[in-house]
Amino acid sequence: MQPTDPTKFTEQAWDAIVKSQEVARRYKNTNLEVEHILLALLEQDMGLAARIFQRAAVDGEGLRQQLEIFTNRQPKQAYVEQLYLGRSLDVMLDRADAARSSWEDKFISVEHLLVGFAEDDRVGRKTLRAFNLDPQDLELAIKAIRGSQKVTEPNQEEKYEALDKYGRDLTEQARQGKLDPVIGRDEEIRRVIQVLSRRSKNNPVLIGEPGVGKTAIAEGLAQRIINGDVPESLKNRQLISLDMGSLIAGAKYRGEFEERLRSVMKEVTNSDGQIILFIDEVHTVVGAGGREGSGSMDAGNLLKPMLARGELRCIGATTLDEYRKNIEKDPALERRFQQVYVKQPSVDDTISILRGLKEKYEVHHGVKITDSALVAAATLSHRYIQDRFLPDKAIDLVDEAAARLKMEITSKPVELEDIDRRLMQLQMEKLSLEGEEKRPGLGADKSSKERLEKIQQEITELEGQQQELSGQWLSEKQMLEEINTLKEKEQELRLQVEKAERATDWEKAAKIKYGELEVLQHDIEEKESKLLEIQGSGNTLLREQVTESDIAEIVAGWTGIPMNRLMETERQKLLQLEGHLHQRVIGQKEAVAAVSAAIRRARAGMKDPSRPIGSFLFMGPTGVGKTELARALAGFLFDSEEAMVRIDMSEYMEKHAVSRLIGAPPGYVGYEEGGQLSEAVRRRPYSVVLLDEVEKAHLDVFNILLQVLDDGRITDSQGRVVDFRNTIIVMTSNIGSDHILSLSADDADYDKMQKQVLQSLRKHFRPEFLNRIDDLIIFHTLKRDELRRIVVLQIKRIEKLLDEQKITLSLSDAALDHIVSAGYDPTYGARPLKRAIQRQLENPIATKILENTFVAGDKILIDCVDGQLIFDKEIEPTTLPEEPEENITAVEVEVLSS
């Protein structure tokens, strides 16, 4: 039979015939033979031939080598211009056509070519014999894959074992112990089983936020099926996860995707309920394959009839948003699915889940995970990582902390790396000194020789330490690896016990459980006790335990919250609060005390946990420390002044500007950018939010602030909920400043002044807004002695700047008093002080530095004489070096005497 008509062959079979010519030219053969066709078939991506040989237990690489023996026997030519059809290939094609006819197929397909190959005397039989096979064995493998299907279409091969190609058998993975244990979720799994047991519309869809464990529920069902912990209607069923990506990938022509999906569905329906399909991200089914105006049908429409009739049992999983966007808009598809809502587990449930997963992660990473680390992962992730969901974020913390520790174990310890670096430096210095010694005409001086001896001595000592530490590190590392290998074997034996128990082979299960497993556990205990002895001596180089601090470090890396703040107890942090704030905010004892008390109340659990840490309205004249107190709060509570989100409320005077806080509505310019307040807090949820000059904002702004102050949350223009529970909200206002300036000097009138200020507030702000603020704090005008302390703080700032230029600064009390007098103005607070310091200190010092009057190493002395600041520098007395008189030359004596 001449292979000239492609219409007689399937696509894969014809592709192999065409590519066999390239194979023949590659081996420089002039005749096109059976072996070239087989090599071309084996080179096809996801080809049927490779799957058939795999089913017949034939090694693909071994088969390729066997076929190459025949190609090497053929006559070769340096340049193959024309190929000739070999006699054995002609016979093979005739046999393939005969097989097609006897099997009542329309096209010659890959399996027909393989039947012809198996009956070939020159190559086929000899090749199969090398693998202890005969033509009947190959035919059985073909029929096992092909089943009862007929070759009626050119792409028929793609429809064989469609579920194997486009799916993943979860029950088989559960049988092999490849799935993680599923802890809890009993209620959801029972609901899924209940829906699957229905006569029609038996298709549950798992709906929940990303990371709450929807896929885990399907895996839990697979494990229950394997263990027989399901009703009769689900016993011995296969749960197969459909991979929509591989189903769509490579579908180039119209209708190709639909054909693949139909072949999958046909396999499922032909199984008579033995196969349950699991489609993760089921929303991708809706619209998949459909093209506007192309006439092709999307996957959702293909599924509807089978879902409704109960021919197909399918479990879907998708997020709430995707379900709303894609499935709810198609009511015909939605009614065929029964919703099973999967909620986020609590912190306690998450800890239980982590305890169940602990062993898997320990064996994978080769480390130990402490229980306190698991508790920390659940609690810290719940508290500090707000944009993700439990248990996924807690599992990720444990996984990353274990991976980090594993990396430390496999890398050199810090102590050894330090020694290596020091040795490298010394070796370079030694080479330099030795080169100087060998240079002609230049001998090394006495100091160089002494230095060389010291270097050599240090190198010898360090090499000894390096050898000792390196040996210790390698032995500890080896011991940890041995323990991990034993634990892997232990896990394999446990899996064998489970398999034996499922197969009711109690003898085998007992033999492993009370024989091999006990011996292995004893070996592990011995190795671990040896490791504990080394660690107990305090000389260990490697850590093998993931602790609470490791988890905290990972959280710090994710969220930007410094590590020491996470581990510091609330009691220590809050007891230091007032003292720390007073270092930055001079005076204002009442304000600092009120802020500290409110934060202590919130952190001690005496306030609704759904509200922000604290919300304050700071009132007072300009320059008295309102903004500085907000900065100090951010610096202390969050270790960074950058954790303060400052919004100037004078920018929100118009009604339409309010939308800038939470983002423009859909359809308006700037919708994608988000709001200034919502985006800032969403990106940095642990911050001090400063709303400056709040009385200047439009009244509608306060409507938005009401839900922030009361519920600790806000919904931006894109529907995202922004969490304000870990923020401190500080609002500043100048309302009532005239009352504070006129009355605050007299303590007796304080109550009267306070009433007048509050009365002014009530005139401007609505009662529902004022009622939601934790504390209204009045800032007093600054007194002269407080201004003096502020000057001292500012001088320290200048000293830091000068320190970079190696210049020191010293002020007399008179100079300090002069600066205070120059900048004292009760109406404007501390701000005139800053201008006075700039004018009277910074400007003259800057000029003298540029004139080289003050240079590195100088100490600037500043005093006040007759109302003017005098700048001078301290002159250090210079002393000549003492030398013996007999060594002084005549010239030097003359200079000294003069």
Curated annotation (Swiss-Prot):
Residues 9-74 are annotated as: Repeat 1. Residues 570-781 are annotated as: NBD2. Residues 6-148 form the Clp R domain. Part of a stress-induced multi-chaperone system, it is involved in the recovery of the cell from heat-induced damage, in cooperation with DnaK, DnaJ and GrpE. Acts before DnaK, in the processing of protein aggregates. Protein binding stimulates the ATPase activity; ATP hydrolysis unfolds the denatured protein aggregates, which probably helps expose new hydrophobic binding sites on the surface of ClpB-bound aggregates, contributing to the solubilization and refolding of denatured protein aggregates by DnaK. Keywords: ATP-binding, Chaperone, Coiled coil, Cytoplasm, Nucleotide-binding, Repeat, Stress response. It comes from Synechocystis sp. (strain ATCC 27184 / PCC 6803 / Kazusa). Belongs to the ClpA/ClpB family. PROSITE patterns: CLP_R (PS51903), CLPAB_1 (PS00870), CLPAB_2 (PS00871). Residues 345-560 are annotated as: Linker. GO terms for cellular component: cytoplasm. GO terms for biological process: cellular response to heat; protein refolding. The gene is clpB1. ATP 1 binds at residues 208-215. Residues 85-148 are annotated as: Repeat 2. Residues 782-898 are annotated as: C-terminal. It is found in: Cytoplasm. Homohexamer. The oligomerization is ATP-dependent. Residues 161-344 are annotated as: NBD1. This is Chaperone protein ClpB 1. One of its GO terms (molecular function) is ATP binding. ATP 2 binds at residues 620-627.
